């Protein structure tokens, strides 16, 4: 049974991209902070960063 895909809002994506631009790897404390401010789970943020790094590598 597949989990449903998370839909990120524009503001969430903006913050995630901003954070990614600053650092490709997010620290646990920062992840906790971002999760509560963006109303997402830490897991969502961790996975978003993993996926974003793959996208970034492909674009290089």
Swiss-Prot record:
Keywords, sorted A to Z: Developmental protein, DNA-binding, Homeobox, Nucleus
UniProt DNA-binding region: 1-60
Top-level taxon of the source organism: Eukaryota
Keyword Ion transport carried by entry: no
Official protein name in the record: Homeobox protein HTR-A2
Keyword DNA-binding appears in the UniProt entry: yes
Subcellular location: Nucleus
GO terms, biological process: positive regulation of transcription by RNA polymerase II
GO molecular function, one term: RNA polymerase II cis-regulatory region sequence-specific DNA binding
InterPro entries, alphabetized: HD, HD_metazoa, Homeobox_CS, Homeodomain-like_sf, HTH_motif
Any one annotated GO CC term: nucleus
């Amino acid at each position: 049974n597949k989990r449903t895909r998370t839909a990120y809002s524009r503001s969430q994506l903006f913050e995630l991209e901003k954070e990614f631009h600053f650092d490709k790897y997010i620290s646990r404390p920062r992840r906790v902070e971002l999760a509560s401010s963006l109303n997402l789970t830490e897991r969502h943020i961790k996975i978003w960063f993993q996926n974003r790094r793959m996208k970034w590598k492909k674009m290089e």
